[in-house]
Swiss-Prot record:
Official protein name in the record: Uncharacterized protein C13G6.13
Taxonomic superkingdom: Eukaryota
Length: 115
């Protein structure tokens, strides 16, 4: 089974996220590099957290500079944001809270990084 990498040390980076219009903006600061990612609000009738402070964010380091951020909200969805400062790559995947589906998506991206 695909195992998640270790959690990133909090001292290595600073994270800020806030709501702006119809999307959440996640600012990631690591050392002297920075990355800005927009997480757009779903058009469906699912409830979205209005106060960004209520969002829970967990970070994992896949490889050097490959950051996996998981944002939880009140709905039954998990927003997975995968970004890389070196590769200038950012991908947003919205999936249901299903362990098998979640692992498949993350493993699929991890295999791309290994190639």
């Amino acid at each position: 089974m695909f195992q998640l990498p270790m959690i990133v040390e909090a001292n290595d980076m600073k994270i800020k996220y806030y709501k702006r219009r119809n999307c959440y903006t996640l600012l990631i600061f690591k050392y002297k590099e920075s990355k800005k990612i927009n997480v757009y609000k779903r058009k469906k009738s699912d409830e979205v957290v209005e106060d960004c402070n209520k969002l829970k964010c967990t970070f994992f380091m896949i490889e050097e500079w490959h950051l996996l951020a998981i944002l939880y909200d009140k709905s039954k969805y998990i927003k997975i944001i995968i970004c890389s400062v070196l590769l200038k790559l950012n991908t947003t995947v919205i999936i249901r809270r299903n362990t098998h589906t979640k692992v498949y998506v993350m493993n699929k991206f991890y295999q791309k990084l290994k190639k």
